[in-house]
Amino acid sequence: MTKKNLKERLDKGPVICAEGFLFEIERRGYMSSGEFVPMVSLDHPEALENLHRDFQHAGSDIVQAFTYNGHREKMRVIGKEELLEPLNRSALQIAKKVALDTSEGIEPNLMAGNISNSNIWNDKDTSQNKEVEKMFSEMVGWAVDCLLYTSDAAD
């Protein structure tokens, strides 16, 4: 089946993107409250893949990579900044795998990246804002790599 892009799908009706990874992964026992860093993509990738499939089964048209809070600031706080890129790349690859893996005759899901808020952005003190921009730019860069430089790129 030919895969339609987002605009084509929206022209035909609503497009659903399931959300709620953070609290559902915590509820399932794969994340502790506190900093809420998505280490599950490295520590238990099968659990993250299963959650994506559950959302897909529930009707989500878009598989959203669980990279929320997977940025340099949060990784620094938990002392795992060196795992930043592997965490993001793993989460993106898992989402892409699930998005493209559908039953025969079923249109593949779209895939999306995800960034979160930052606790260091301050519109009154711009000294940290370049760091925030860089932090999110690198996440977007890894998502672009995942989409463009691997086979069967999702939209």
Predicted regions and their residues:
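N-terminal small/glycine-rich loop or linker at the start of catalytic domains
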Residues: 6-42, 68-75, 104-132
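Alpha-helix-loop-beta-strand connector modules within alpha/beta enzyme cores
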Residues: 80-102
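Glycine-rich, proline-tolerant flexible connector loops at the mouths of alpha/beta enzymes
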Residues: 36-43, 56, 62-84, 151
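A structural motif corresponding to the C-terminal end of an alpha-helix
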Residues: 58-59, 94-109, 142-148
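Conserved, mostly hydrophobic/aromatic
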Residues: 19, 55, 95
